[in-house]
């Protein structure tokens, strides 16, 4: 008699499926990576036109999050495309498992893909735009805000991509739903990232407030998405 498969084992199977598919096709990583490079080129052309008339350090926090958000949207839009094209969503739903396991596996896979692109794109951003500015001692703290922001983006984006997967204009609908929902997170992460990169007076207070709010957002939205996912995926 076969024993019941644990939720953790189901999670590993689903996560492994996503990772193996991506390693075989490179669809998400390639498209997200090329898009990130294109955004960096556009930023570079814009700053080249302005010359030294712009303070890149004070704009860097906002630019980093523009890069991350729109790159993540491209990946989230394809989060369930393989399952839809292969018509296997229905098959997964027939498996006797907690639907939240599907959500958690997709959240982690989306976070891994986004982090992989960030590991390449953010050093390129620094190389292109920040080398002319002396790095602040607080510079390493910006990693914390990027990590918290990426978790929140993946948590919310995974739920919303499930909602829009069958929509005719799913990419447009995903962006329309995604941006307003993550705006509070973006606001706090931009403030925290800018404070860490600039390192002005009292930067730690701004950074701490932003990180705490981002962490609270991640917890609330991840739990809410986890609870709602059963209803969303079964609708």
Segments the model singles out, each with a brief description of its role:
Residues 1-32:
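Aromatic- and glycine-rich beta-strand/loop motifs that create alpha-glucan
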Residues 22, 73-93:
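Transmembrane helix boundary and interhelical loop/hinge segments in multi-pass membrane proteins
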Residues 45-47, 160-201, 205-209, 213, ...:
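Transmembrane helix segments
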Residues 46-59, 122-147, 193-211:
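Membrane-interfacial helix-loop-helix connectors in multipass membrane proteins
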Residues 60-76:
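Long, hydrophobic alpha-helical segments
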Residues 99-126:
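Selective transmembrane-helix segments that form parts of the transport pathway or gating/packing helices
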Residues 134, 145-179, 231-235:
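A structural motif at transmembrane helix-loop-helix junctions in multipass membrane proteins
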Residues 218-235:
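Junction motif at the cytosolic side of a transmembrane helix
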């Amino acid at each position: 008699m076969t024993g019941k498969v644990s939720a953790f084992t189901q999670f590993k199977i689903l996560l492994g499926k996503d990772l193996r598919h991506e390693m075989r096709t490179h669809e998400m990583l390639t498209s997200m990576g090329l898009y990130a490079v294109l955004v960096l080129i556009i930023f570079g052309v814009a700053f080249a036109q302005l010359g030294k008339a712009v303070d890149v350090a004070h704009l860097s926090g906002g630019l980093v999050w523009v890069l991350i958000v729109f790159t993540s949207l491209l990946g989230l839009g394809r989060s369930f495309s393989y399952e839809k094209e292969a018509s296997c969503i229905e098959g997964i739903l027939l498996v006797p498992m907690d639907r939240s396991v599907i959500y958690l596996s997709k959240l982690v896979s989306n976070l891994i893909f986004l982090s992989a692109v960030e590991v390449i794109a953010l050093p390129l951003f620094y190389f292109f735009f920040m080398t002319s500015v002396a790095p602040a001692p607080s510079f390493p703290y910006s990693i914390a805000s990027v990590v918290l922001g990426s978790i929140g983006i993946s948590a919310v984006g995974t739920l919303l991509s499930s909602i829009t997967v069958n929509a005719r204009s799913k990419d447009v609908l995903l962006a329309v739903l995604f941006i307003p929902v993550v705006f509070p997170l973006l606001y706090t992460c931009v403030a925290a990232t800018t404070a860490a990169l600039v390192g002005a007076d009292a930067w730690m207070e701004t950074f701490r407030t932003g990180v705490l709010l981002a962490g609270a957002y991640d917890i609330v939205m991840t739990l809410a998405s986890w609870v709602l996912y059963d209803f969303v995926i079964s609708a």
